[in-house]
């Protein structure tokens, strides 16, 4: 049977100029006004502002417009610190005062909880308008991010653009500096651009990742460590020739970079290819535990918030020396290592065996013999796994990815673990999973924001639940 395809209909545009009053921000931090009895979305504006805009897209149920000028400013408006704000897609809220950013994120969670609890008819009911909010965990709103992926694009004249994606497009915004990256990484863009211009094979680079990490020299017997070093990971689509290897080596020596070449299958320090000192990456927790990781591993990008988050988790859970603690979605052991220093035993579970192996190694390096790590698919049924059978857990911590932990929280409820600490990077799935726990006899005791990604719409949250029995 033949298949027939219709070409995509281009959105209607009118280029009409309007003056509107902004009612609110949507979940993504985009301003919402009313026009022709439908919402019109405008980036870069704030509630109660009167703005002149140009309509750039019309649909039957909504429209989009571009900000032209602001006739009446909000008292919450501040001057963005980044010269690329509005073009670069990395930040959403630089025009909004920091405390107002936190209120916006808190309201976002409140709205999602209200929606989730009402649609699921949760019993017992909780007053989602008055959640038990605690003080937010914050860091400096600038120069906090210790890891980022930088895009690379070459034009037909082999001229490089390096930076981050523009809003709603695959095109890159050419970045000169980034004020949310930690200081050593913030100023790396001009150096990379100069280096890329000198490469003999330019099409071989996919992207570049930059990381601030502690470095241990594995070629020496005493593993000499250097703190807060710059790591540059080069994603190569083709093998790098000797000339380009030499160029990267020159820049590494000149600017104290530690360069890693990623060919898609393995990651090798440039030193292993060219000869020289090899190294390992790590970061330190407040309790001096060392977490070793590879450049392609997930780590929390805000070092200060990460340490404060771990400290708050320990305080809220009130870990006792007699406690058996379950750490789900444990990753490299970011929480497990700290928990193990206070608990009788910690069982960490992660979906990827490679992460399980690294978490196990991290516990050994830190001299912890009361940690065991296991691999399991936590999005399936795991109550019959050997690490659960015959075990009694006093407390559980879970830190899932954005998809949340719908299967996991249902099984936690079956086990009736008395105390549950949920660390979330997605408020929608957090609201869904919280509704499940409350419906199965858990009480929401505490909730706090964690401003891991200041200046952006992204929301991280910590919630403590206790079983009502």
From Swiss-Prot:
* Chain segments annotated as transmembrane: none
Pfam short name (any one): TRAM
Q: Which CDD domains match?
A: AdoMet_MTases
Q: Which domain of life is it from?
A: Bacteria
Q: Which residues form the active site?
A: 425
**What keywords is this UniProt entry annotated with?**
4Fe-4S, Iron, Iron-sulfur, Metal-binding, Methyltransferase, rRNA processing, S-adenosyl-L-methionine, Transferase
Catalytic activity, per the record? uridine(1939) in 23S rRNA + S-adenosyl-L-methionine = 5-methyluridine(1939) in 23S rRNA + S-adenosyl-L-homocysteine + H(+)
Q: Which GO terms describe its biological process?
A: rRNA base methylation
- Molecular functions (GO terms): 4 iron, 4 sulfur cluster binding; iron ion binding; RNA binding; rRNA (uridine-C5-)-methyltransferase activity
TRAM domain boundaries: 11-69
Where along the chain is S-adenosyl-L-methionine bound? 300, 329, 334, 350, 377, 399
Q: Transferase among the record's keywords?
A: yes
Residues that bind [4Fe-4S] cluster: 82, 88, 91, 178
Query: EC number(s) on record?
Result: 2.1.1.190
Q: Which Gene3D superfamilies match?
A: 2.40.50.1070, Nucleic acid-binding proteins, Vaccinia Virus protein VP39
* HAMAP family for the chain: 23SrRNA_methyltr_RlmD
UniProt record similarity statement? Belongs to the class I-like SAM-binding methyltransferase superfamily. RNA M5U methyltransferase family. RlmD subfamily.
Query: What role does this protein play?
Result: Catalyzes the formation of 5-methyl-uridine at position 1939 (m5U1939) in 23S rRNA.
Q: What is this protein called?
A: 23S rRNA (uracil(1939)-C(5))-methyltransferase RlmD
Source species of the chain = Colwellia psychrerythraea (strain 34H / ATCC BAA-681)
């Amino acid at each position: 049977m033949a298949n027939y395809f219709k070409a995509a209909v281009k959105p209607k545009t009118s280029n009409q100029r309007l003056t509107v009053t902004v009612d609110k921000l949507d979940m993504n931090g985009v301003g919402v006004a009313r026009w022709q009895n439908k919402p019109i979305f405008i980036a870069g504006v704030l509630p109660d502002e009167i703005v002149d805009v140009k309509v750039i897209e019309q649909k039957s149920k909504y429209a989009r417009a571009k900000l032209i000028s602001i006739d009446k400013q909000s008292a919450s408006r501040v001057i963005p610190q980044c010269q690329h704000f509005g073009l670069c897609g990395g930040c959403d809220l630089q025009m909004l005062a920091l405390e107002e950013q936190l209120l916006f994120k808190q309201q976002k969670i409140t709205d999602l909880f209200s929606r989730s609890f009402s649609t699921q008819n949760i019993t017992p009911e909780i007053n989602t308008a008055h959640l038990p909010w605690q003080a937010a965990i914050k860091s400096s709103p600038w120069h906090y991010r210790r890891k980022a992926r930088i895009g690379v694009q070459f034009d037909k004249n082999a001229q490089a653009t390096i930076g981050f994606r523009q809003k709603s497009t695959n095109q890159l915004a050419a970045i000169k500096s980034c004020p949310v990256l930690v200081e050593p990484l913030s100023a790396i863009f001009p150096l990379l651009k100069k280096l890329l211009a000198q490469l003999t094979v330019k099409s071989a680079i996919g992207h570049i990742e930059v990381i601030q990490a502690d470095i241990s020299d594995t070629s020496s017997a005493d593993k000499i460590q250097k703190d807060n070093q710059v790591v540059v990971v080069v994603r190569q689509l083709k093998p790098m020739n000797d000339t380009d290897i030499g160029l990267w080596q020159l820049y590494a020596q000149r600017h104290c970079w530690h360069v890693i070449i990623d060919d898609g299958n393995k990651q090798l320090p440039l030193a292993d290819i060219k000869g020289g000192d090899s190294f390992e990456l790590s970061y330190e927790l407040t309790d001096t535990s060392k977490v070793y990781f590879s450049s392609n591993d997930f780590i929390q990008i805000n070092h200060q918030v990460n340490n404060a988050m771990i400290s708050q988790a320990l305080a809220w859970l009130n870990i006792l020396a007699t406690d058996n603690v379950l750490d789900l979605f444990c990753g490299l052991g970011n929480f497990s290592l700290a928990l193990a220093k206070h608990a009788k035993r910690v069982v960490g579970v992660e979906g990827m065996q490679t992460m399980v192996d690294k978490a196990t190694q991290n516990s050994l390096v830190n001299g912890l013999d009361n940690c065991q790590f296991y691999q399991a698919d936590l999005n399936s049924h795991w109550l019959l796994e050997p690490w659960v059978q015959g075990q009694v857990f006093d407390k559980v911590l879970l830190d899932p990815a954005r998809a949340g932990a719908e299967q996991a929280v249902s099984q936690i409820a079956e086990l009736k673990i008395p105390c549950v600490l949920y660390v979330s990077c997605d408020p929608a799935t957090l609201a869904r999973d919280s509704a499940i726990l409350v419906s199965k006899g858990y009480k929401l005791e505490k909730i706090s924001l964690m401003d891991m990604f200041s200046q952006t719409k992204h929301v991280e949250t910590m919630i403590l639940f206790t079983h009502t029995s």
